[in-house]
Amino acid sequence: MSEEIKKGLLGIVVDETTISHVVPELSALTYRGYKVQDLCDKCDFEEVAYLVLHGELPSKKQLKKFIKEERSNRKLSKTIIKNIEKMPKNAHPMDVVRTCVSLMALEDKDTKDNSPKANIQKVMRIFAKTPVALALSLIHI
């Protein structure tokens, strides 16, 4: 019986995407056609985030605008801050992130708008706030 149980996500298809692919013959993972290892070697984190969101690597001007927008979206709401402060001291960081992202989604002004433009804005806000929430949780937990 235990031989039939698959470990982890082996053989499990969660969904299909045009963003990333596993290329077994190259032993590589790709994002938008670029090997992840090459992106790690040659790009900043923000450049890769831009690539994932927009489908192409940014120009210097696009990257500057992207970074400025990300920085302007870092502020956490009082609700999220209070919830982080109330979390158990032994909370796992992934549980904190999951809870904070759920709260961000509930508070987001574009929650019900699923247009491509609104979805990119929602991702940008989550992208900006998540590391701040995690850092704050490490201080309080």
Where are the language model's segments positioned?
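Hydrophobic alpha-helical bundle cores within soluble ligand-binding/oligomerization subdomains
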Residues: M1-I139
